[in-house]
Amino acid sequence: MIYENNNFTLSQDRELPIVGFFVISPKKHIEKLNELSEQERNEMFSIINTVIKIEKDNNICKDFNVVFEEKDKRHFHVRIMPRHERMSKICNNITQNIGLIFDYAKKNFRTENIYNKINEAVKITREQFRS
């Protein structure tokens, strides 16, 4: 857990070893974005903006895709997906091929070096959320 408040959690999915990849999940079960109140949506977007600012300010990544995951009978969540240069070599459109990126990361990014970079990104993000 990187950050937590009354409504949301921010975490890094260790199964997807991508530096700067974070997931925001509401604590209450919802399936769709429109099930959040206006206050909750504003809070969620504030978390998104803070994560992206932290990552840019600390040279973790400079470009991102923000993916809203809505599926029937599933829990809504937001993925902050960094667009590292090396990812463009895997595919041209990250949002259309997110599964391809995830599969590639699971097979090729599970290295000590990558996990060290992920841990550093998590540490930086956690510390800056606390300050």
Model-predicted segments: where are they?
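HIT superfamily nucleotide-processing domains
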Residues: 1-131
